[in-house]
Amino acid sequence: MRGRPITIAALCADIPSRTLERCNVKVEILGFTTKNWKGGEAREKWSKNGKPKNPGRLNDLRHIIYKAADVHWRQSKKNLGLMLKEGLLKENIDGEAIQWAFNRLVKRKEERKIMMVISDGAPVDDSTLSVNSGDYLEKHLKRTVKFIEANSDIELLAIG
């Protein structure tokens, strides 16, 4: 997600988080991308190992904490600008990012937990999709969502 979509996503994260924080609701703003275009160390390792079939993800993940739940918005507002930094955001491996966010959220002590995902569409990583099925990342995302819905009381919302 880059350009106008990430600008809108940043606003969608910023405005509600400030409002909720004023109501003493803890909010965490997380982001995700890949470290490289078209693979990285994961793809190099796969290639060095003889390119076995069905390798799974072939790009390196970058998970970003723009605002931690226990950090006040004023202390992290500059971090939100990182979303707009040219060159930071690359490809999207949504399922693993949602697993990461889920693992963070289940550790929280709050009684009610809501995860809102703002997306520009389907997960995309050319390196992974070039050697796995074309719907590999989308299937993983759907399995991840089903797992969260079936195995936790976290409310999952999605835009995009």
Enumerate the language-model features and the residues they cover.
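Acidic, glycine-rich A-domain
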Residues: 1-160
